[in-house]
Amino acid sequence: VLGLWLFVALATRECALRLAQFGAPGSGWAELGALAVPALVLIALARPSALRRALFGPHDDACRLAGCGPLALYVFTRLWAGNATPGDAAPLPWLPLLNPLEIGLALAVSGLVAWARSLTPPQRAAVPRALPASLAGATALALVTGAVLRACHQLAGVPWGEHALWTSTLAQAALTVVWSLIGVALMLAGHRAARRVPWLAGAALLALVVAKLFLVQLADHGGLARIVSFLVVGVLMLVVGYFAPLPPRRAQAGEAVAAP
């Protein structure tokens, strides 16, 4: 396990230094270098292989948790930190989802998912059931939010900073539309699968959107972008109210099916 950590640390350092030469400090290249090696190691060790048998031997399950767990924690924390950066891709042109930072974030997500799926049932049972789903949902929303804000910064010239993004009519309108679409998608999926948890998660996200509309965008005099935001949210709420009402509880659904 110590040898694995040493290898990952040295390889990550070397990869980060090499890729950082392509851009300025803190660019997307540096983040890609910091995430690529540990994420790829998590992916490589997620499935039974000769490499994993050579590293962990007869203690595969325990060593996979003790050896790869800290790597997964590093990747998770680095993913959140990298998501808060503008992700400059110079000297290459910046492309949504195809820039160094977001490629690194995609590798990180793939590595975390692969590692989580490789855990044994007893190891999964030791973790509260709501915790992985909550972390996954919060991380997914944060990644989508970061991608939208980076697109506004890179493509529309909105300055990268808390105040500038908070007061930008374009950034706030884009977040409103994207969050609303995600909320509606969750509610539709929950209704179709007769599962209340995703439906309630989508409803909570739509409630957050409405609060943001009134607390942030209502005070803004941005004109067209603000009007479009209100119209989109209103139409989506009408759609979801008609096509995806709150699904019944499982017990109630079972009684309804059993009734003649």
Give the ranges of each region predicted by the language model.
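Alpha-helical transmembrane segments of multi-pass membrane proteins
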Residues: V1-P260
